[in-house]
Amino acid sequence: MNLDGNQASIREVCDAGLLSGAVTMVWQREKLLQVNEIGYRDIDAGVPMQRDTLFRIASMTKPVTVAAAMSLVDEGKLALRDPITRWAPELCKVAVLDDAAGPLDRTHPARRAILIEDLLTHTSGLAYGFSVSGPISRAYQRLPFGQGPDVWLAALATLPLVHQPGDRVTYSHAIDVLGVIVSRIEDAPLYQIIDERVLGPAGMTDTGFYVSADAQRRAATMYRLDEQDRLRHDVMGPPHVTPPSFCNAGGGLWSTADDYLRFVRMLLGDGTVDGVRVLSPESVRLMRTDRLTDEQKRHSFLGAPFWVGRGFGLNLSVVTDPAKSRPLFGPGGLGTFSWPGAYGTWWQADPSADLILLYLIQHCPDLSVDAAAAVAGNPSLAKLRTAQPKFVRRTYRALGL
């Protein structure tokens, strides 16, 4: 077995100046089969990409927050069918837009309260500024993230929902709301709860919402492509050195390949990693089980046919039909689960092969409702976007899967 060929697509985009660098891992049956360290974590400084590089993992944060919430479910402090107003009374009088892209003052009442399960499956009717269009998009972009969770939630509660709770999937701030609820249940800062309930037990010592002064040198620089397809690094500032005023439960974590591998191994291992139990088998089963109806799957997701051969558990995509999923999303047996991050971070766990793949980069993309079409129309972006699927397909082929 030779896995070296899975690097080719990544090295190609790095050599073409479309990507700064990447760290990838292939793990199977309790063995780390491969680690690729490609390119640079800081091009200008000439610092090579290394295994211990810290990445902004964006929405790969979401399953970690969900795991913290499910640990509360395990203890009977929270239930999936609980109305969120029990801990978030700000959202007790939600209205629904008559037209999702229409005026904010044209609404009708919500048929029911938002449930915890609605948050975990993004069926609450909440949104992101980039997942919707019109006045509601602009309103989401003005939310005050820098003033703490209570101020942020109060502002969010003034916005109408884009659809009825439970009707369909709209990618949203739902997990940020979940983070506020988890913090209120435990009466503690979110970073402390996630550390005590997930990161600590799982042995994820390099993961958090802030990066110590000593570890700052390991943080990967964020890049974007300008109009001439040249890499620019003036995208984001350095990591927080102390806990931020509002820990972004839906996208604020930094992590390393080794750390996140431990988290995914925990999910693949029914809640345990290296003999330490983090979650109950039932909570992990719930996270990894498709919960969407056929009607919900008829709708596109961020402009793409995301649900072909796939479903959605508790913030995890789940392969339900490998034959239908494979042509669009690459190889992965029944029950394969995953959730990516906006900056190109990606992972997949395939129970049928006892296999985990990790692919970590730092690239700031175009985030819009038609982002999928924008990528398809730009050869450079399409080339960059296909580097990861080629890595996956070549890995599966080399493993004889």
Swiss-Prot record:
Q: One GO cellular component from the entry?
A: plasma membrane
Superkingdom of source: Bacteria
Q: Which Pfam families match?
A: Beta-lactamase
Q: Which residues form a coiled coil?
A: none
Q: Which SUPFAM superfamilies match?
A: beta-lactamase/transpeptidase-like
PANTHER family, alphabetized: BETA-LACTAMASE FAMILY PROTEIN (AFU_ORTHOLOGUE AFUA_5G07500), BETA-LACTAMASE-RELATED
Which protein is depicted? Protein Rv1367c
